[in-house]
Curated annotation (Swiss-Prot):
Keyword terms of this UniProt record: Disulfide bond, Seed storage protein, Signal, Storage protein
Subunit structure: The mature protein consists of a small and a large chain linked by disulfide bonds.
SUPFAM superfamilies: Bifunctional inhibitor/lipid-transfer protein/seed storage 2S albumin
Native organism: Arabidopsis thaliana
Pfam families associated with the record: Tryp_alpha_amyl (PF00234)
Name of protein: 2S seed storage protein 1
Signal peptide as annotated in the record: 1-21
Lineage per the UniProt record: Eukaryota, Viridiplantae, Streptophyta, Embryophyta, Tracheophyta
The keyword Oxidoreductase belongs to this UniProt entry's keyword annotation: no
Propeptide: 22-37, 74-83, 163-164
Length: 164
């Protein structure tokens, strides 16, 4: 009798734990596995260089600025008549970012941009649309900067589940 009572209590406790655990949402971020990725060693080299040198500082600032301004999904520099000095600073930041990208090896442009976007994302609390804009900017920078051999970076832009 005691064994049956114990089994019933254990089964009820297990059901309660499973029900309670299913209430929570989890966002999981996957990193590419260097072992299964044929260009894994190159990616490791790019990542090490990015971490060692902290490359792409101007690009990180540009991504953050673009996200904060809340512009459309297109990457552009609109004429800001109210703040021409701000537009000039943004243009200088853009030129510095493009110069930083031109110094990268072509194979490392997209991986280092992805790392830079991730670093910007982790620097502060951003709304989902801001995070999307950070990655959108990073993805299209090679094209906008006219980087040889690179057009648009093939990495995915993070999506966030709807809670409504």
């Amino acid at each position: 009798m005691a064994n049956k009572l114990f089994l019933v209590c254990a089964a009820l406790a297990l059901c309660f734990l499973l029900t309670n655990a299913s209430i929570y949402r989890t966002v999981v971020e996957f990193e590419e596995d260097d072992a299964t990725n044929p260009i894994g060693p190159k990616m490791r080299k790019c990542r090490k260089e990015f971490q060692k040198e902290q490359h792409l500082r101007a690009c990180q600032q540009l991504m953050l600025q673009q996200a904060r301004q809340g512009r459309s999904d297109e990457f552009d520099f609109e004429d800001d008549m109210e703040n021409p000095q701000g537009q000039q600073q943004e243009q200088q930041l853009f030129q510095q970012c493009c110069n930083e990208l031109r110094q990268e090896e072509p194979d490392c442009v997209c991986p280092t941009l992805k790392q830079a976007a991730k670093a910007v994302r982790l620097q502060g609390q951003h709304q989902p649309m801001q995070v999307r804009k950070i990655y959108q900017t990073a993805k299209h920078l090679p094209n906008v900067c006219d980087i040889p051999q690179v057009d648009v970076c093939p990495f995915n832009i993070p999506s966030f589940p709807s809670f409504y």
